[in-house]
């Protein structure tokens, strides 16, 4: 009886051993599969980080394209066999930078600012008109102030005394009678946009979509009666008098018109180029990378309403025309509004809100009870 039991136990032990071996092999296979999945995940993550690193490298060294045209292959590590392919193109006054991996079907596209327009580390630069700059109200200047040789006066306007911050002597610099020059190649790009209007076709919201910058640029035009637009990416919208309502959705497009009016409450992103005027309502938020540019008319003009924000550049070029009586101001920024970026006005500007960045002004003024006071900054 005992021999029979032992003889029967041997196959059972063998079966159990085989099952245990299979379980061990299955566990090892799962572990190996997890290692392979992690390796694929890690490789993909590293390639994505490589794309970001290549873009960051370009942002600190734009000379990497020198002699290479608009495309360059970047090798980030000596021991790595893979490269990142960078391509760039102008988009308004910005650049579109696309990074692609030659190892995996991955890409990364960003819109970034171009090279610094000036080597001057200026918070504000006022053209010397043989009169001092006057500060009134709650005006504050943080950073280097390039002012006329006659310096700065701290004064009261309409009974409101100066209660801002005094500018340290060490932060003051002497300006000149001419504004620092700007990159003329960017102006050529704008003219090229304007010359392409004949190729545009009529805009219809039902056909709107986001167009990637790797695709051909879509050229559209809007009628004066149109007010709602849903457009994004690689698209240019033309018109004579464009009106952008709060119901519109714009994501990084370029707009070209004689005049543009952005109605109260609009939130979006775009670069707006006009030849006459650009009117921003109240409570408007133009997120980065946006921009306002007016040039070409006898009296170009930008108005920014209360509680509005512009994240990007604000530029008005009037050819340096003299306007001593301030009949045709170039920029009127209302109190409570904010500009984050470059302000370049070769005419007269009223800065009554906040500017985070640099402001280059041909002249400045404030307005009290319908009267314009030249040479005064007042917040």
Predicted regions, residues:
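Beta-strand/loop motifs with alternating small/hydrophobic and polar/acidic residues, enriched
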Residues: 2-128
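Extracellular/secretory-pathway and virion-surface proteins
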Residues: 29, 376-378
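Glycine-rich beta-solenoid repeat tracts in large extracellular/virion proteins
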Residues: 242, 260, 302, 329-332, ...
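Flexible, glycine/small-residue-enriched loop-and-beta-strand segment within the central core
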Residues: 284, 288-311, 320-322, 327-330
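Structured N-terminal alpha/beta-domain signature
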Residues: 34, 51, 218-221, 227, ...
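Long, well-ordered mid-to-C-terminal structural blocks that present hydrophobic/aromatic surfaces
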Residues: 237-238, 243-300
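Short, ordered "entry" segments at domain starts
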Residues: 88-236, 247-249, 266, 272, ...
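Short acidic-hydrophobic surface loop/beta-edge motif
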Residues: 70-77, 365-373
């Amino acid at each position: 009886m005992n021999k029979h039991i032992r003889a029967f136990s041997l196959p059972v032990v063998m079966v159990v051993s085989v099952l245990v071996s299979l379980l061990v092999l299955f566990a090892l296979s799962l572990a190996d599969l997890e290692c392979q999945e992690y390796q694929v995940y890690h490789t993909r993550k590293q390639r994505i980080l490589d794309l970001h690193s290549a873009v960051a490298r370009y942002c600190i060294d734009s000379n990497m394209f020198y002699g290479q045209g608009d495309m360059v292959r970047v090798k980030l590590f000596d021991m790595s066999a893979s490269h990142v392919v960078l391509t760039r193109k102008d988009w308004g006054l910005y650049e579109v930078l696309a990074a692609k991996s030659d190892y995996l079907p991955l890409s990364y596209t960003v819109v970034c600012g171009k090279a610094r327009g000036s080597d001057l580390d200026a918070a504000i630069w006022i053209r010397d008109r043989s009169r001092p700059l006057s500060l009134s109200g709650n005006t504050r200047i943080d950073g280097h102030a390039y002012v006329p040789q006659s310096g700065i006066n701290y004064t009261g306007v309409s009974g409101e005394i100066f209660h801002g911050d005094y500018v340290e002597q060490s932060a003051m610099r002497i300006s000149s009678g001419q504004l620092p020059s700007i990159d003329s190649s960017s102006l050529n790009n704008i003219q090229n946009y304007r010359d392409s209007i004949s190729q545009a076709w009529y805009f219809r919201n039902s056909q709107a979509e986001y167009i990637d910058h790797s695709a051909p640029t879509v050229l559209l035009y809007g009628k004066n009666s149109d007010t709602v637009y849903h457009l994004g990416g690689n698209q240019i919208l033309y018109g004579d008098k464009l009106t952008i309502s709060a119901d519109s959705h714009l994501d990084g497009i370029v707009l070209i018109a004689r005049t543009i009016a952005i109605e109260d409450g609009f939130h979006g992103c775009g670069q707006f180029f006009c030849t006459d005027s650009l009117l921003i309502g109240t409570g408007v938020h133009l997120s980065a990378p946006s921009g306002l540019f007016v040039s070409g008319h006898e009296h170009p003009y930008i108005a920014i309403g209360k509680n509005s924000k512009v994240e990007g550049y604000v530029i008005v070029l009037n050819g340096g025309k003299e306007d001593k009586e301030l009949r045709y101001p170039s920029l009127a920024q209302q109190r409570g509004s904010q500009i984050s970026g470059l302000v370049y006005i070769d005419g007269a500007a009223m800065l009554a809100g906040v500017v985070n960045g640099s402001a280059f002004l041909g002249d400045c003024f404030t307005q009290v009870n319908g009267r314009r006071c030249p040479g005064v900054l007042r917040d």
